[in-house]
């Protein structure tokens, strides 16, 4: 298993006793470890849990079944005949011949470079997930006056989180005429804290050379292009980008697995098997982008 897929317990209980998890992070659990807000586990466990609590339930189940795992282990390559090459500090280069491989590498966030926003490259521009990790796990505050671009759930949650940590979130701008986040998150993360949501708006300029000093947003038309004369300027030191996810599929492509050009993920059958027999793709490596 490449990555921290939470339901590995089900594979074990179905009769697969020889399982090895290869995780590049320092702990199991994946992105859940930095999601300290509640709302997890309602359907699975019948109670409301934080992300780390939710992950801990599955980690405990894996440990009870004595499922093997290697942390700080980076998978370098996967071949079509299911040969895995990985590396870590303790063992050096690791070669594994597997009978089956489950790919659960997740996603990475789309960066500022993919948006073509005019301006320099000053400090103070973060993806929402990076800011979440800095605040929730590393104990660092990215900034004090914030604009957030994108109204997906991570952007909404970080608007609330930054506010609770003492920052001033001036606005959440969304390119589309609707929010991509859950209605409850719009209410609990924006409305309850008086944070305005500007739909059909985007960032058109980032000011500042060493550090972000200002942001300009503008309304966009049906063609998603800025409308002249609708610009609004904000005096900020930080911008958080919540503008979509890109599947971590470098290993998938390297193995020669057939990819879906629309979702950027692997093409799979109903049992999640890819075009290579014995190689399965699960989790967020199937994320769909509009």
What are these regions (language model features)?
Residues 4-5, 27, 107-109, 152-154, ...:
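Residue-level detector of alpha-helix initiation sites
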Residues 56-88, 96, 163-253, 258-260:
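A Rossmann-like FAD-binding core segment of flavoenzymes
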Residues 56-145, 222-229, 240, 267-270:
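FAD-binding core/adjacent interface of flavoenzyme oxidoreductases
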């Amino acid at each position: 298993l490449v990555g921290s897929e939470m339901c590995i317990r089900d594979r074990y209980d179905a009769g697969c006793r020889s399982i090895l998890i290869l995780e590049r992070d320092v702990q199991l659990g994946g992105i859940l470890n930095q999601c300290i807000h509640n709302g997890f586990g309602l359907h699975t466990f019948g109670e409301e849990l934080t992300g780390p609590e939710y992950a801990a339930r599955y980690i405990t189940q894996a440990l009870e079944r004595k499922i093997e795992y290697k942390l700080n282990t980076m998978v370098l390559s996967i071949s079509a005949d299911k040969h895995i090459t990985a590396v870590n500090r303790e063992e050096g280069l690791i070669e594994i011949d597997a009978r089956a491989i489950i790919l659960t590498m997740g996603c990475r966030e789309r960066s500022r470079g993919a948006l073509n926003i005019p301006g320099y490259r000053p400090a103070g521009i973060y993806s929402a997930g990076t800011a979440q990790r800095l605040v929730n796990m590393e104990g660092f505050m990215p900034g004090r006056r914030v604009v957030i671009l994108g109204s997906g759930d991570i952007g909404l949650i970080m608007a609330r989180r930054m506010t609770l940590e003492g920052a001033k979130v001036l606005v959440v701008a969304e390119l589309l005429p609707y929010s991509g986040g859950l209605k409850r998150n719009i209410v609990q993360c924006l409305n309850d804290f008086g944070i305005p949501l500007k739909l059909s708006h985007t960032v058109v300029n980032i000011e500042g050379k060493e550090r972000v000093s200002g942001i300009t947003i503008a309304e966009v038309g049906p063609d998603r292009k800025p409308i002249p004369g609708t610009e609004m300027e904000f005096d900020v030191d930080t911008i958080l980008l919540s503008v979509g996810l890109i599947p971590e599929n470098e290993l998938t492509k390297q193995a020669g697995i057939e990819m879906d050009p629309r979702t950027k993920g692997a093409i799979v059958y109903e049992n999640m098997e890819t075009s290579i027999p014995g190689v399965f793709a699960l989790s967020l490596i199937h994320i769909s982008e509009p």
